[in-house]
């Protein structure tokens, strides 16, 4: 008896590019930064990251299972990445209950309130981070200084970050320039700050991994970093006493982390290469404005969230032409 022909709907050819595959690559790309943060801040970095990831997983499971009454979505690893990125935006000595609150806001409000993965207009981890920054400003701006593996989680010594010092210099306190760490320490990762801000080098390694795996393209990271470099470079040339070398901006704060791992989120970023470039330029511009003229020393989180809101307009403006459509 002849074998029956089974006909299915398209697509018939698959490239193997799945959500799980891309998320897995992102997790691997974040691991070098986590390892370096452990050597810089000690066990506190691991405690904060583990608490954040477990909290995000729990809240996504609970909301999906008991409120939305849908099958579990933990397998797509998006909640895991949200947990890691939220932790990377926190100091390594933050109280555990604040991490849980941040995870609840990130998953419950930033993601699941809009329907889950693929529907959220804002980056969930940044929603949680900004909520904590506004609600607990003292704890969220208390940065442990590098103390190595033996650093205490509870009694960690705190100090100013490079961005704090850059802001003081721009405000007229030029003596703060003597306290700035060397560019080498900033690049390698021997300075205070959030868990994920410690080393520009390992974050760039993560960028290479994501580019080689074709998880992201160059458009967003390069446009953000280029915009920040150009704007801060111009300010430095105009007044080198008040404005620091642009390399300090590129290696300080959450710029690298945000440009590589957060602004490139598929759901909350533009769909076309042209749109991605304009999106990145907007983030870079807002970051510089907030860093120098805002109330907070770091502007990356606010810049990304603001540009997340503009993404629908960018997508509409940068809509690709239909095949055969005449130029307007």
Regions found by a protein language model. Name each.
Residues 124-204:
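Long hydrophobic alpha-helical segments that form multi-pass transmembrane helix bundles
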Residues 1-24, 292-328:
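Cytosolic-side transmembrane-helix boundaries in multi-pass membrane proteins
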Residues 58-70, 107-118, 205-214, 260-269:
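C-terminal ends of transmembrane helices
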Residues 25-33, 48-60, 78-83, 87, ...:
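Alpha-helical transmembrane segments in multi-pass membrane proteins
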Residues 42-55, 93-102, 190-200, 243-255:
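Structural signature of hydrophobic alpha-helical transmembrane segments
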Residues 1-57:
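N-terminal signal-anchor module of multipass membrane proteins
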């Amino acid at each position: 008896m002849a074998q029956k022909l089974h006909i299915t709907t398209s697509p018939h050819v698959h490239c193997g590019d799945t959500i799980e595959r891309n998320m897995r690559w992102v997790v691997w790309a974040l691991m070098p930064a986590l390892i370096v943060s452990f050597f810089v801040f000690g066990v506190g970095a691991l405690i904060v990251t583990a608490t954040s990831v477990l909290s995000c997983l729990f809240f996504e499971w609970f909301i999906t299972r008991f409120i939305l009454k849908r099958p579990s979505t933990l397998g797509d690893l998006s909640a895991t990445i949200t947990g890691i990125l939220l932790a990377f935006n926190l100091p390594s000595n933050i109280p555990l209950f604040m991490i849980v609150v941040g995870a609840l806001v990130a998953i419950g409000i930033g993601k699941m309130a809009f329907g889950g993965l693929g529907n959220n207009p804002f980056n969930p981890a940044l929603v949680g981070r900004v909520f904590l920054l506004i609600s607990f400003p003292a704890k969220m701006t208390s940065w442990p200084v590098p103390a190595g593996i033996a650093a205490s989680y509870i009694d960690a010594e705190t100090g100013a970050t490079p961005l704090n010092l850059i802001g003081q210099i721009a405000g007229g306190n030029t003596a703060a320039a003597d306290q700035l760490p060397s560019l080498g320490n900033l690049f390698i990762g021997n300075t205070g700050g959030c868990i994920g801000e410690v080393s520009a080098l390992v974050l760039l390694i993560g960028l290479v991994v994501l580019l080689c795996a074709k998880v992201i393209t160059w458009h967003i990271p390069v446009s953000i970093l280029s915009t920040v470099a150009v704007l801060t470079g111009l300010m430095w040339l105009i007044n080198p006493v008040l404005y620091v070398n642009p390399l300090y901006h590129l290696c300080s704060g959450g710029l690298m982390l945000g440009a590589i791992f957060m602004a490139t989120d598929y759901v909350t970023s533009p769909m076309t290469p042209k749109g991605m470039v304009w999106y990145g330029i907007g983030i870079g511009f807002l970051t510089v404005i907030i860093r120098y003229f805002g109330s907070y020393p770091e502007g990356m989180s606010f810049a990304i969230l603001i540009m997340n809101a503009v993404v629908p307009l960018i997508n509409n403006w940068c809509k690709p032409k239909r095949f055969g459509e005449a130029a307007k």
